[in-house]
């Protein structure tokens, strides 16, 4: 049966920004000659080496050099890396095509000492000689999970194309970053990092060429490790990759269990496990772009307290800077001593402090960060070797080249000196796609020109004239020496929302260290900055977990940073779609992620902000943030919003031990903190498109109101017992293991329905105003019994901040043989074993030797 996303209601009417692709966008290159095996297929230690050459068509040139120079000789290397992961690399024999760097600034490839034998792998690689095609088959049920049969293989220097068959109406998830339904249907997803508000279906800040499919209750996944721009077309019966460079470097994943959560473990085994946040990072955050002065920031902090709405972290946007230059202070509105004093007061009050830093550095010879960077020669270059100078908030700017040998030393000094002086607890790195407000090196020869009018302040005619001039200058600059590719205007034009590739970013002809064109490395820029910034903070304080939040990301970014979904809008569809956006990043291995609560652009309303605070309080990263052009939206401004915020944030704080335990599991295993229902219950066909509810872990179900004017919500419940979090009453008893039960739940304006799964034990605390105060209270256990009268749960405890944890406890609880069925709370007296006395309903602590969580276990709770 056809499945329709819950997300879209009049999206195009609201945003006016749905792309219209042509039939050619969706078509495959049917005239391409393809390839055939040429020579001996050789078995290797890892698997297979297959030499290919272009199929001969005599004198016919049809399908040759269509979008670039056709590469005649290519190879296929098949590597059985683990029992659940298969690596298939299709590359040019001459090894001239650009690969993602094997480094923390790209993709750290696994160092495999012993490959598995094909017979022990859960994935089978099958191929056809002429025309060459291949299949990847999951062995346990003989399901073909990737199939290129009768699909063209195109391998040109600036165009790669490969397609796989998928079932009609397949359940595909992932491929981003894009604002779209969680389940991907008939559309084109473009991967080219771009500074732009979250337009539906258009490419935005990051690039994640990874998808998961759930088919017949089992999950598998595929990653294309390629940082070039690409279109990924999902259409009926097919997924097609159209890539403008590099190689086809695929990783396929098929966990033996078939469980989507085990697929997340397998994927993050490759790209890296998500970073572990400190306690304070799990609290409520507040920010605004456009606070006029520090008095206003301090007033917001005070009014949160007066309204008794918990506030853990105060953020300051670029407003604090002098002329929006990094590492400076507005002497009038945000003087340095007041900014330092704000941090000191926050820390005294048990709160935290984060500020923004952008990568673009003002090109001004009186500005020390620019002078030092110029002396160290760390800037991205033009094709002629001069510094590339774009335009961002402070006017004409240079951009650090993260791949330059001096870049780490340069950034370390700037970051460490600044953080040490200001006393902030973390950094927010924005505009790192990288963003530029002009086309090309528009500031060449204009160092010391100072602030420039922003492009949107010009009339349309003036903007067009400026663009014409910039484009003429960019073309005149030409390609880097020896470069034969068309870097500015490749013949295959991906569906970049900005138009040409160099629009509003660093020009594709600009050069990074080693003469690498930006064309080849663009999608890695924010990812590289994330790693270097994290390492700078570790160098500053090497015992404390660093905090970095990034806008642009790539597979593996979650090891270093968290992510917010960027400049969304204060419209109901964006509230609704925030769930899908966050679920995507859970799947991408960035578990510390969230959206701007109440919306960033445009004016929110009391009802919208109230409903957004209710679900936003449970985002893995939870922050209210809005734009300087929008009206105020602090949650204390409306009575209903304040009441809903107090309830929701206090409920989150009550659950902080549960959240923290989930983040530890994410850091150790790679599981998401938020989880889509279909990933926990893959046998339930009715859940495949549900992106309006979410699970927190496996045990807490959130069913928010996401539509204007509604005071109830239709919620889907999988099999089992589901208890109301607030009343402890049994809400749903679903005896089916394949069919959901849909229930209409009352949800007045200040209420978000929350349910706990029967069979779960949730560790909790008594909520206080700050995270520190909350964690200082005794632990409680909230127990919801299943139909057998049993329940289990887990609690992870450490000091809440150490980078290298030297002492931690892992507790696993199990309650059994208790009747009648019900809902109970159990008191935990920390550090003692007598709380497990039979008086507390025969609760038993299970320390299962050899279990996965046991790896972090160092303190035996049974010891005196």
UniProtKB/Swiss-Prot annotation:
Catalytic center residues: 430 (nucleophile), 433, 567 (proton donor)
Family: Belongs to the glycosyl hydrolase 31 family.
Lineage of producing organism: Eukaryota, Fungi, Fungi incertae sedis, Mucoromycota, Mucoromycotina
Gene3D superfamilies: Glycosidases (3.20.20.80), glycosyl hydrolase (family 31) (2.60.40.1760), Golgi alpha-mannosidase II (2.60.40.1180)
SUPFAM superfamilies: (Trans)glycosidases, Galactose mutarotase-like, Glycosyl hydrolase domain
EC code: 3.2.1.20
Keyword Transcription regulation: no
Known role: Hydrolyzes not only malto-oligosaccharides but also soluble starch.
Keywords: Glycoprotein, Glycosidase, Hydrolase, Signal
Catalytic activity: Hydrolysis of terminal, non-reducing (1->4)-linked alpha-D-glucose residues with release of alpha-D-glucose
Signal peptide (UniProt feature, chain positions): 1-22
Major enzyme class: hydrolase
Any one GO MF annotation of this record: alpha-1,4-glucosidase activity
CDD domains: GH31_MGAM_SI_GAA, GH31_N
Protein name listed in UniProt: Alpha-glucosidase
Source organism superkingdom: Eukaryota
A biological process from GO: carbohydrate metabolic process
């Amino acid at each position: 049966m056809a499945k329709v996303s819950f997300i879209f209601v009049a999206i195009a009417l609201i945003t006016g920004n749905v792309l219209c692709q042509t039939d050619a966008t969706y078509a495959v290159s049917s005239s391409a000659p393809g390839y055939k095996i040429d020579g001996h297929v050789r078995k290797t230690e890892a698997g297979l080496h297959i030499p290919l050459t272009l199929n001969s068509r005599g004198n016919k040139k049809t399908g040759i050099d269509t979008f670039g120079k056709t590469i005649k000789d290519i190879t296929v290397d098949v590597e059985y890396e683990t029992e659940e992961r298969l690596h298939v690399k299709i590359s040019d024999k001459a090894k001239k095509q650009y690969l993602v760097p094997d480094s923390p600034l790209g993709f750290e490839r696994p160092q495999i000492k012993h490959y598995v034998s094909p017979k022990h792998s859960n994935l089978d690689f099958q191929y056809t000689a002429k025309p060459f095609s291949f299949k990847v088959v999951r062995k346990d049920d003989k399901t073909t999970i990737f199939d290129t049969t009768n699909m063209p293989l195109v391998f040109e220097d600036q165009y790669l194309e490969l397609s796989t068959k998928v079932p009609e109406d397949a359940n595909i998830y992932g491929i981003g970053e894009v604002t779209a339904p969680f389940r991907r249907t008939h559309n084109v997803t473009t991967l080219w990092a771009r500074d732009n508000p979250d337009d539906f279906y258009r490419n935005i800040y990051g690039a994640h060429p990874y998808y998961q499919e759930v088919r017949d209750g089992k999950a598998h996944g595929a990653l294309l490790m390629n940082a070039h721009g690409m279109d990924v077309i999902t259409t009926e019966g097919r997924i097609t990759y159209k890539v403008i460079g590099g190689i086809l470097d695929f990783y396929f994943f098929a966990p033996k269990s078939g469980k989507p959560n085990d697929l997340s473990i397998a994927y993050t085994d490759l790209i890296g496990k998500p970073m572990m946040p400190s306690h304070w990072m799990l609290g409520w955050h507040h920010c605004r772009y456009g606070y006029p002065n520090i008095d206003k920031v301090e007033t917001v902090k005070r009014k949160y307290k007066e309204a008794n709405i918990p506030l853990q972290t105060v953020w300051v946007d670029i407003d604090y800077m002098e002329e929006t230059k990094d590492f400076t202070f507005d002497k009038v509105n945000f003087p340095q001593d007041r900014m330092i004093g704000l941090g000191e007061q926050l820390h005294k009050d048990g709160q935290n402090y984060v500020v923004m830093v952008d990568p673009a550095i003002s090109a001004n010879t009186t500005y020390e960060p620019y002078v030092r960077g110029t002396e160290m020669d760390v800037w991205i270059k033009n094709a002629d070797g001069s510094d590339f100078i774009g335009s961002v908030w402070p006017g004409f700017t240079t951009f650090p080249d993260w791949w330059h040998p001096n870049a780490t030393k340069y950034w370390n000094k700037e970051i460490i000196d600044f953080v040490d002086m200001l006393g902030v607890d973390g950094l927010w790195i924005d505009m790192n796609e990288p963003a530029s407000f002009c086309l090309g090196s528009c500031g060449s020869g204009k160092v010391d020109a100072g602030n420039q009018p922003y492009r949107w302040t010009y009339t349309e005619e003036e903007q067009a004239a400026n663009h014409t001039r910039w484009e003429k200058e960019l073309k005149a600059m030409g390609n880097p020496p020896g470069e034969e590719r068309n870097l500015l205007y490749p013949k295959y034009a991906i569906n970049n929302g900005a138009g040409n590739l160099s629009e509003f970013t660093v020009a594709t002809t600009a050069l990074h260290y080693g003469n690498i064109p930006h064309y080849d490395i663009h999608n890695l820029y924010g990812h590289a900055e994330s790693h270097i910034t994290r390492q700078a903070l570790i160098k500053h304080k090497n015992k404390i977990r660093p905090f970095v939040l990034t806008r642009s990301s790539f597979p593996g970014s979650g090891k270093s940073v968290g992510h917010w979904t960027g400049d969304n809008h204060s419209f109901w569809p964006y509230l609704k779609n925030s769930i899908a956006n966050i679920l995507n990043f859970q799947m991408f291995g960035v578990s510390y992620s969230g959206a701007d609560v109440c919306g960033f652009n445009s004016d929110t309303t009391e009802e919208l902000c109230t409903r957004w605070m209710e679900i936003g309080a449970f985002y893995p990263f939870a922050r209210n943030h809005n734009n300087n052009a929008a009206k105020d939206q602090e949650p204390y401004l409306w009575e209903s919003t304040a009441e809903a915020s107090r309830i929701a944030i206090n409920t989150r704080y009550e659950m902080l031990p549960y959240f923290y335990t989930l983040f530890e599991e994410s850091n150790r295993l790679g599981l998401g903190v938020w989880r889509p229902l279909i990933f926990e219950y893959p046998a339930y066909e009715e859940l495949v498109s549900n992106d309006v509810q979410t699970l927190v872990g496996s045990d807490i179900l959130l069913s928010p109101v996401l539509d204007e004017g509604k005071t109830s919500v239709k919620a889907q419940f999988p099999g089992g017992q589901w208890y109301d979090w607030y009343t402890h009453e049994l809400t749903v008893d679903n005896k089916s293991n394949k069919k959901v039960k849909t229930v209409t739940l009352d949800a007045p304006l200040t209420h978000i329905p929350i349910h706990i799964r029967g069979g779960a034990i949730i560790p909790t605390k008594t909520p206080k105003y700050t995270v520190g105060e909350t964690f200082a209270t005794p632990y409680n256990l909230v127990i919801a019994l299943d139909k057998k009268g049993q329940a289990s749960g887990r609690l992870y405890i450490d000091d809440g901040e150490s980078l290298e944890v030297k002492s931690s406890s892992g507790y696993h609880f199990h309650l059994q043989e208790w009747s009648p069925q019900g809902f109970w709370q159990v008191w935990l007296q920390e550090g003692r074993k007598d709380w497990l006395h039979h008086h507390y309903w025969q609760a038993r602590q299970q320390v299962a030797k050899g279990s996965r969580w046991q790896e972090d276990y160092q303190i035996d709770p049974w010891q005196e």
